[in-house]
Swiss-Prot record:
Gene3D superfamilies: Helical scaffold and wing domains of SecA, P-loop containing nucleotide triphosphate hydrolases, SecA, preprotein cross-linking domain. InterPro entries: Helicase_ATP-bd, P-loop_NTPase, SecA, SecA_DEAD, SecA_motor_DEAD, SecA_preprotein_X-link_dom, SecA_SF2_C, SecA_Wing/Scaffold. It comes from the Bacteria. This is Protein translocase subunit SecA 2. Its main location: membrane. It catalyses: ATP + H2O + cellular proteinSide 1 = ADP + phosphate + cellular proteinSide 2. It holds the Pfam family P-loop_SecA. One of its GO terms (cellular component) is cell envelope Sec protein transport complex. Monomer and homodimer. Part of the essential Sec protein translocation apparatus which comprises SecA, SecYEG and auxiliary proteins SecDF-YajC and YidC. Belongs to the SecA family. It comes from Nitrobacter hamburgensis (strain DSM 10229 / NCIMB 13809 / X14). GO terms for biological process: intracellular protein transmembrane transport; protein import; protein targeting; protein transport by the Sec complex.
Length: 803
């Protein structure tokens, strides 16, 4: 009851906001005559004047209507198109820090210009995060003429850019880039040794395009910077040979997709490792001495059992490239850590890359929550409204479409996989006979290629340049991670009369499939409309209903006709993996639609709840890690930016001395004079007189601390006098930053291991988080103590070599 009331209140609040936005949009439209005849120079001067008013303290809300109207006029002049009321409403929702749910084809790219131009006036920079570099470069180039007319600068961030180019792009008013690159630049900036080397200039406002991909699907994926550990290729190859020979009885997979050796598996692996000289009896894999070897065995087992070629990764040109499991896009440059990627390379017979360790890492969840204001756009958001609100504090506003949606959506659940295949072929043949273009959705690369093989077996040919030039009929194209370089070309032809395209979820994300083809004339477009528009065929339902909606959304854009139909079967993985119990009909070829809808929604709901709980759990862990990361980065930044390094070093040195004395000179026991003397000599490189009265257990430990501190202070003063304060502080600051980087890298790996260990304990969620927080804090205290001691030791030893 309470939940229903809360949802009703939320729905009422959304309706009220939409009413307000519609009224504001009407006022913005009414300003059009005032701006239509303005000379370009006056348009730019108006924006410059508004920028000055913002810097003087005026709120953006007070000028948003005029800025939106000016940007709308700039769009008309630069692109010969201007934002319609639905796009203005979407931009108003974005300005208020919401997720704007705008259906596919409603013009999110143009909508973004309104809110980006407004927030650019703060002078703090606007970041537009896209799912891939193609969209970043396309959108920046496409919208640049609009921003130019307003006197606003536009930059773009791509993976191959050097620091100077990145810095220049970040200095622009509006910066487009891949979401991951913004996160990587944040991590890299926090490892720079001077403020002048950093590239970003703050986190004021971020607009996340395709927000569901970045803020939901990839939210918990760590963005990590790696450093080399060394070459262990022969070890990976040897262990791979052992694991490749295992039988299913040697391992087991639990419901959470974790794999472990059985007792028979341990015996088999140990025997083979002994034969290869990698393990010596009586030592077993359970012994502490075998921890590293066991780690490599487990990673190889994961590579062989859990990761599948053409689903999780592809192999091309002798290298392994990971694939985004949700979009089907290749992720060049992304690598598994902790030896898993090397295990994959050994499995596939590729050249084994150098093993790496994590230098720094952050998740999208944590990174984007750093922005003072965050907003997002996507075609499918309502299903994840709770998650957007719980994790990011963002409400979802569904924006009405500019034109009515006339697409027809259907779903058929077949009793058998064979019946499903026959139905798909019938749909395809009928559409082909009408000249209707067809987009067939596949959940993975492997399934897309299986569909291609099925079509070829039924007389179809895969389209290439030769078949295209000959005008061969009954052809199809395949778009997946293996053919991503031809994505633009394939999408351009996907709406042509009779075109058939098999695609993974990467198809057309951020692009329109135009009826008739990319450069179609009115006659070809009319031909496709007469045939029914684009037909989308889903070959199974996805684990998440949102992914189904994204596929359906390829058809029926901007009021175009279209149809989508999902053909699934009781044998499909999305049903069997959800453990949905279904009674198979004895004779019926399909399941009644009411029953089918219930089954499909129940299966998807189970997957969605599991995924949400997993991401929420990871966020709770990551929030604890983030507190430590913030403390470390704040400390490092204060050293880098020249805050009083000497004062900090003195405080750390005094705390180190206090730690040593507390360890060896406890009030409740006789003092360990020999141990204290050794520790002082080891850490401080000093010989301090601790003879009586300080050798007396009843003596004042504070007086002893004062003597040690005074001796250390004189030693440091002597170094400063001989080296010069500027040189000493510069060397000491760099040493301190290098120490922070080293210790934080090790701490990050310890926290990752701790997360996994606690996960293996299978505790209730609240207990797991509580244990992680307790143990993580103990690890952090130890890291800070190590930092104090190491800084002190280096400071006491630092000097300039004679030339």
């Amino acid at each position: 009851m309470i939940l229903r009331l809360a949802r009703r209140a939320l729905s009422f609040g959304t309706c009220r906001k939409l009413t307000q936005y519609e009224a504001t949009a009407r006022r913005i439209l009414a300003l059009e005559p005032d701006h239509r005849e303005l000379p370009a120079g006056v348009l730019r001067d108006r924006v410059a004047e508004l920028r000055q008013r913002v810097r003087a303290g005026i709120a953006l809300d007070e000028i948003k209507e005029e800025v939106f109207a000016l940007t709308r006029e700039a769009s008309r002049r630069a692109l010969n198109q201007h934002p319609v009321p639905a796009q203005i409403i979407g931009a108003l929702a974005l300005h208020d820090g919401h997720i704007a749910e705008m259906k596919t084809g409603e013009g999110k790219t143009l909508t973004a210009t309104l809110v980006c131009a407004l927030h650019a006036l703060t002078g703090q920079g606007v970041h537009v995060a896209t799912p891939n570099d193609y969209l970043a470069e396309r959108d920046a180039g496409w919208m640049r003429p609009v921003y130019d007319l307003l006197g606003l600068s536009t930059g773009v961030i791509t993976p191959e850019m050097d620091d100077d180019s990145r810095r220049e792009s970040y200095r622009c008013d509006i910066t487009y880039g891949i979401a991951s690159e913004f996160g990587f630049d944040y991590l890299r900036d926090n490892m720079k040794f001077s403020a002048a080397e950093t590239v970003q200039r703050g986190h004021a406002f971020a607009l996340v395009d395709e927000a569901d991909a970045t803020l939901i699907d990839e939210a918990a994926m760590p963005l990590a910077l790696f450093g080399p550990l060394g070459d262990h290729s022969s070890l990976y190859q040897a262990i791979d040979a052992v694991i490749a020979s295992l039988q299913p009885r040697h391992y087991e997979i639990d419901p959470r997709r974790r794999v472990a050796l059985t007792e028979a598996g341990y015996s088999e692996v140990e025997q083979r490792l002994q034969q290869q000289g990698l393990l010596r009896a009586p030592t077993t894999l359970h012994d502490i001495a075998s921890i590293s070897l066991l780690h490599h065995v487990v990673q190889s087992l994961r590579a062989h059992v859990l990761l599948a070629r053409d689903r999780d990764y592809v192999v091309a040109n002798g290298s392994v490239t990971l694939v985004d499991g949700l979009t089907g896009r290749p992720m060049p440059g992304r690598r598994y850590d902790e030896g898993l990627h090397q295990a994959l390379e050994a499995k596939e017979g590729c050249a084994i890359g150098e093993e790496t360790h994590t230098l720094a890492a952050i998740t999208f969840q944590t990174y984007f929550r750093r922005y003072a204001r965050l907003a997002g756009m996507t075609g499918t958001a309502k299903a994840d409204a709770e998650e957007y609100n719980d994790i990011y504090g963002l409400d979802v506003i569904s924006i009405p479409t500019h034109r009515p949606m006339i697409r027809v959506d259907e779903s058929v659940l077949h009793a058998s996989a064979a019946g499903k295949v026959r139905a798909i072929l019938r749909e395809l043949e009928d559409a082909s006979a009408r000249g209707q273009p067809v987009l067939i959705g596949a959940p993975s690369i492997e399934r897309s290629e299986a569909l291609a093989a099925m079509l070829e077996a039924n007389g179809w040919r895969q389209r290439d340049d030769e078949t295209k030039s000959k005008g061969t009929t009954r052809t199809f194209a395949v778009l997946n991670a293996k053919h991503h370089s031809r994505e633009a070309q394939i999408i351009a032809g996907a709406g042509a009369p009779g075109a058939v395209t098999i695609a993974t979820a990467m198809a057309g994300r951020g692009t329109d499939i135009r009826l008739g083809g990319e450069h179609a004339d009115a006659a070809r477009r009319a031909q496709v409309i007469a045939a029914g528009g684009l037909l989308v065929i889903g070959t199974t339902h996805h684990d998440h209903g949102r992914m189904d909606e994204q596929l359906r959304g390829r058809a029926g854009r901007q009021g175009d006709p279209g149809r989508s139909v999902f053909h699934a079967s009781l044998e499909d993985e999305f049903l069997t993996n959800a453990a949905i119990s279904v009674t198979r009909p004895e004779q019926a070829a399909t399941i009644a639609s009411s029953v089918a809808s219930r089954l499909i929604r129940a299966a998807q709901k189970r997957h969605e709840i599991y995924s949400f709980d997993r991401r929420l759990g990871l966020l709770r862990f990551d929030t604890i890690i983030q507190r430590q990361r913030d403390h470390v980065y704040d400390l490092r930044r204060s050293i880098r930016d020249g805050s009083d390094t000497l004062t900090l070093a003195t405080r750390l040195r005094n705390e180190t001395i206090d730690d040593l004395i507390a360890r060896f000179a406890t009030p409740s026991a006789p003092w360990d004079i020999a141990g204290l003397d050794h520790a002082i000599r080891s850490v401080l490189t000093l010989a301090v007189d601790i003879s009586p009265p300080f050798a007396d257990p009843k003596a004042d430990a504070k007086a002893l601390a004062r003597r040690v501190r005074a001796t250390a202070d004189r030693w440091i003063d002597g170094k400063i006098a001989s080296m010069g304060e500027t040189v000493f502080v510069d060397i000491l600051g760099r040493l301190m930053m290098a120490l922070i980087d080293h210790l934080w890298s090790a701490q990050s790996e310890r926290l990752d291991h701790l997360k996994r260990r606690i996960g293996d304990r299978r505790l209730p969620a609240h207990k797991a988080v509580a244990e992680f927080q307790l143990e993580a804090f103990a690890l952090f205290e130890r890291m800070i103590a190590d930092f104090r001691r190491d800084v002190t030791a280096y400071a006491m030893r630092v000097g300039i070599l004679p030339t």
